[in-house]
Amino acid sequence: MILKVLFDKVASLIGLIVLSPILVIVALLIKVKMPGPILFCQKRVGQHGKLFTVYKFRSMTVKHEASMASKDSEATSIASTEQSRITPLGEKLRRYKLDELPELWNVLKGDMSFVGPRPDVPGYADQLQGDERDILKLKPGITGPASLKYRNEEEILSSVSNPIKYNDEVIFPDKVRLNLYYLHHYSFRKDIQMIVCTVLGKKMDYAGEQI
């Protein structure tokens, strides 16, 4: 995966430079419209199970972001379905994935890759058993097959009566399946395709289905 590592370093550096005006504008908007810290920082499980700090633009109220950031192994990976916790600006940032732009710094540092499993909190990563733990051989990614398939995860969870149960029994196992497929059928060409589909909001054929 030498090509993947090289691409991550070069593309993340270029991305940070090219997108710096947008990063500054978003940071200023958050500072003006959402009093409090600009960034949301949280410990996530990285490659080989090593914890690292992920950086995102803050999209929730200060009280809830602080609660999320301080959660330990009992935290969940479930996207919040309580829209009252997300600010109007935060909702727009999430809709266009602008809240994830600071993760380019994580990619440049080597904590993450452009494509891979989403970095999970310890509570859910600890549920991986047996061969499932092979997923931890990968660097977590900004996007990936599971991210593409569940790009509307918040909407899905808000439509079911028991979001936690649905996530535990349906979404989480399916994400594990897709991430294992990604590990065992790695393709740099597919990486590029997934990045393009993420940016353009398009679907693609992967692992015998449309994601």
Regions found by a protein language model. Give the residues of each.
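Juxtamembrane loop-helix boundary motifs flanking transmembrane segments in multi-pass membrane proteins
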Residues: M1-I2, S77, T81-R85, E100, ...
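N-terminal alpha-helical segment
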Residues: K9, R85, D174-V176
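Hydrophobic structural segments characteristic of membrane proteins
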Residues: W105-I211
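Short acidic-aromatic low-complexity motifs
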Residues: R94-E103
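A hydrophobic, helix-centered structural microdomain
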Residues: M1-H64, Y182-I211
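Short, glycine-rich, amphipathic interfacial segments at transmembrane boundaries or analogous
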Residues: F40-R85, A146-F172
